Structure formats: C-alpha cells, structure tokens
Amino acid sequence: YGEIRFDFNLGTNANPEDQYFLEMYTLADKNNLIVQIHPNKGQLPVLERLLKKYPNVIFLAHVMPDVKKEIGKLLRTYDNLYYSLDAEIHYIYGYQTIQDNKGPTREEYLKFIRKNFDSLLKEALGNWKQIIEAHPNQLTWGSDRWYTWHFDPEVGGLVTEFGRTFIGHLDPAVQENFAYKNAERMLQDR
C-alpha cells in the first residue's frame, strides 16, 4: 500500500485517525494489505487503536526509537504489527536531534559512520537485540532511504555492511527471519 508518514518536522502533522486515513485503512483491511506507518511521537496509543480496529491490515511501523519497550508490548499483543529497523540504527537521516530536516551531507555521513561504526553497532545491539530475539517473527531489517545521496553506491555499501554486521550479532536462530524471511512471509501472506 505504501508508507504513511506522520512526523514531518515542518508544519502541522496529520492525525493517523483522520477520516482520510481511516478510509485507507478500511480499504487495506478489506484487501489484506500492508500499510507502512511512521508515527509521530506520542502516537503509540493511536497505533494500538488502529491495530485493534483493522486486524486484517499488517501495520509495518518504523522509526520509533523512543518507545522500544512499548513496541515490544504491542508486538506481544498484536500479530498484525511488524516493525522494520532501518534508519534509526545507522543514522542515515542524521545524528543530531534535528538537522533542519535535511540531514547530513553524503561526506559528513560517511565520515561519521566510519568513525563511529563499532560504537553505533554496540548501541544498536543494546537497544534492539533483546526485542528482536523476543519477537523473532515480527521484526525485519530495512534500508530506509530518502535523500538523493542515500542511493550512492558507497553509502549503500556501508549501510549494507552495517546491517549484515548487526544481523551477524543476533542469535543464529533469528538471523534469517530478521534479515529477510519475516519480510517474505509478510508479503506472501497477503
């Protein structure tokens, strides 16, 4: 179905429960579609209401690093919630709180990730390894991209290296699920 983003840093963000979106979810529910959702801070209760109301929709949430524990609780409760780990663990959109909604340059990112690769990997594993291993069928690796330079081969190679290294540190019993099988299953079940 596509991604619905509710956390733009400019202007007023849309409400995931606006009638416009409810009609989309209803259509997705009738047709067993996947909706990737990028909630804003404070919208976790809204996400839970949507999970309850639309049980035939797979909600693929991502970039909610401030509510990791709560995501774990929702994963235990709702089979129709999946979570994609991507930009939030390799900082492709920036490593400062807000970089004026434009992120770092290609050169700044490459320098930052190379310099901090090991510490970022340790941080990512500390934040997510336990959650992934507790919910081995609902989390998946992603490679979220936005800015033009995100598609640069050198950047893509480094993001891939980070992802593979991260996956290599997970329990071998969950590595394939997280790397690709959960995504395959999510798509095949549709």
Labelled PLM ranges:
Residues 1-12, 31, 140-141, 145:
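Active-site groove signature of glycoside hydrolases
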Residues 15-141:
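Catalytic pocket-lining loop regions of alpha/beta-barrel enzymes
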Residues 130, 136-138, 146-190:
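Mid-to-C-terminal alpha-helical segments outside catalytic/metal-binding sites
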Residues 8-12, 116, 163:
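Conserved short-loop catalytic and cofactor-binding motifs
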Residues 1, 28, 83, 144, ...:
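Conserved, mostly hydrophobic/aromatic
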